[in-house]
Amino acid sequence: MKSITVIVETPRYTAGKYVYDQEKNIYMLKKILPLGMYFPYDFGMIENTLAEDGDPADAMILTECITYPGVHISCRLIGALQAKQRENGKEIRNDRYMMVAEDSLLYGHIKKIKDFSKEHNNQLKEFFINYGEVEKKELTDLRFSDVEMAKKDLVKLTT
């Protein structure tokens, strides 16, 4: 799979959740996380995809750069955090695809999710469980998928 363009919506270490409003062609502050909670990585949307929740597929981007909403980053897929989400009585898949910025010097050595420590991956799962509670969405069956499985899943979402 060639490089994947991810558009940053919410920069890392921010407590504000930003979303792109297609009708207005602007980024809007959607939600503020509780005191002490922040996004551990840049979060964004993958171009030319449509996930089960009706939005472009979600991505987490590892980069040492400071970013802001609207920045386009060429990335390499390293896997995904699969999640089932219950919202309004309906269960859907709402995976977060994990990416490394292609030009990253700090994270360039990371090729797969297993390159992270077990503690890192457990904390990432906990972040999403807590984030789901803030959003009033129940996330279940959180598990990591390898690069190949993530590629197959992402291809299915391509528009």
Task: For each feature predicted by the language model, list its residue ranges.
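Hydrophobic N-terminal alpha-helices or hydrophobic patches in metabolic proteins across all domains
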Residues: 1-159
